[in-house]
Amino acid sequence: MTLMVPFKQVDVFTEKPFMGNPVAVINFLEIDENEVSQEELQAIANWTNLSETTFLFKPSDKKYDYKLRIFTPRSELPFAGHPTIGSCKAFLEFTKNTTATSLVQECKIGAVPITINEGLISFKAPMADYESISSEMIADYEKAIGLKFIKPPALLHTGPEWIVALVEDAETCFNANPNFAMLAHQTKQNDHVGIILAGPKKEAAIKNSYEMRAFAPVINVYEDPVCGSGSVALARYLQEVYKFEKTTDITISEGGRLKRNGLMLASIKKEADNSTSYYIAGHATTVIDGKIKV
């Protein structure tokens, strides 16, 4: 196919351009999904060379507002956090929808409920499953990161498979310098996408504030500037560690080492049926608005 279709590049988890994590969003809402091949979508994502490129399609069912497909330069993902928020922002602009307060995104992992409140876009994590890891694996990851962890790390299934580890404080997290070759080897060997490193901001005015970093060298993302699925993983991990008994908000900063200033708002919500859900919210701003030849 050779078409000119609407295209946006959206900066996510920031209100100020160039300070968050960009996602390319391509509007295929007027194109049947079977008109474009997997190979064509992958080629576009490879060319944009962003951590993720997304494609908006018509949903398969009326219970959804749109279908989203998410690609890295190498492969398709079942779900990702910052592309979900950035693509929602783009969808609202593409469709000139200024009044929506809730949407449902269809993606490979299933339905993702989204709310919009005065520009703040929030999604309910479709999955956040916790799994313990062996002491040998913990030692290997400590060696790769070059730090001792203050709590046993764990594997979090949030779409991507993240190891989550806590260090003493935000400064320790910020100053970490992983051995990326060793980390890539460990994550490839264990079939993990990477590691989420976090440290509490002990002097912060806001309770439950954390500095976070996301390392995924095995997929050529040495450090993700601001990672939505990673923030889901961190929130779920903190719930497992600290056993919050009521709804708890977590403020997560990320990107400082990359000269970014991302801000994510996580909510560990206690539902009426006594289950626990995880929500991630953030702002997004469109930086590029035009067309792309596909």
From Swiss-Prot:
This enzyme's EC code(s): 5.1.-.-
Mutant phenotype after disruption: Leads to defects in unfolded protein response.
Gene Ontology BP, a term: endoplasmic reticulum unfolded protein response
Recorded superkingdom: Eukaryota
Keyword S-adenosyl-L-methionine carried by entry: no
Enzymatic class: isomerase
UniProt organism field: Saccharomyces cerevisiae (strain ATCC 204508 / S288c) (Baker's yeast)
Listed name of the protein: Uncharacterized isomerase YHI9
Pfam family, one: PhzC-PhzF
Residues forming the catalytic site: 52
NCBIfam families: PhzF_family
GO cellular component term, pick one: chromatin
Keyword Mitochondrion: no
Family per similarity comment: Belongs to the PhzF family.
One Gene Ontology MF term: isomerase activity
Entry keywords, A to Z: Isomerase
